[in-house]
Amino acid sequence: MIQPQTYLNVADNSGARELMCIRIIGASNRRYAHIGDVIVAVIKEAIPNSPLERSEVIRAVIVRTCKELKRNNGTIIRYDDNAAVVIDQEGNPKGTRVFGAIPRELRQLNFTKIVSLAPEVL
């Protein structure tokens, strides 16, 4: 469960290292974001000489959360960190690589480009 002021790791090579959620895209009063939700975030830490800079406001899709993800077949998936992938306005990832495992629920949410870049889909 991601809420405003939550820090997230970046799971791609876009140039950002750490994000802070400032808004959840969707209904005007959504309190929490889960896997597959799009958020507005600010870059808190970035790699030097990268196209993304610190304090830049960007969009990102959440790919891992510490809170459990319950599937219809009864399995539960939990990750060790909160992580997101930086995307543009059309929903395409800004990076060319994605690090770590990605849940298969992203494919049903039309983030197929992120799923195809991922090394492992759970």
From Swiss-Prot:
Species in which this protein is naturally found: Arabis hirsuta
Keyword Transferase: no
UniProt superkingdom: Eukaryota
Family: Belongs to the universal ribosomal protein uL14 family.
Database matches in InterPro entries: Ribosomal_uL14, Ribosomal_uL14_bac-type, Ribosomal_uL14_CS, Ribosomal_uL14_sf
Compartments in which it is found: Plastid, Chloroplast
Subunit structure, interactors included: Part of the 50S ribosomal subunit.
Record function comment: Binds to 23S rRNA.
Segments passing through the bilayer: none
GO cellular component: chloroplast; cytosolic large ribosomal subunit
Alphabetized GO MF terms: large ribosomal subunit rRNA binding; structural constituent of ribosome
Protein name, per record: Large ribosomal subunit protein uL14c
Gene symbol of the encoding locus: rpl14
Alphabetical UniProt keywords: Chloroplast, Plastid, Ribonucleoprotein, Ribosomal protein, RNA-binding, rRNA-binding
GO biological process: translation
Gene3D superfamilies: Ribosomal protein L14 (2.40.150.20)
SMART domains membership: Ribosomal_L14 (SM01374)
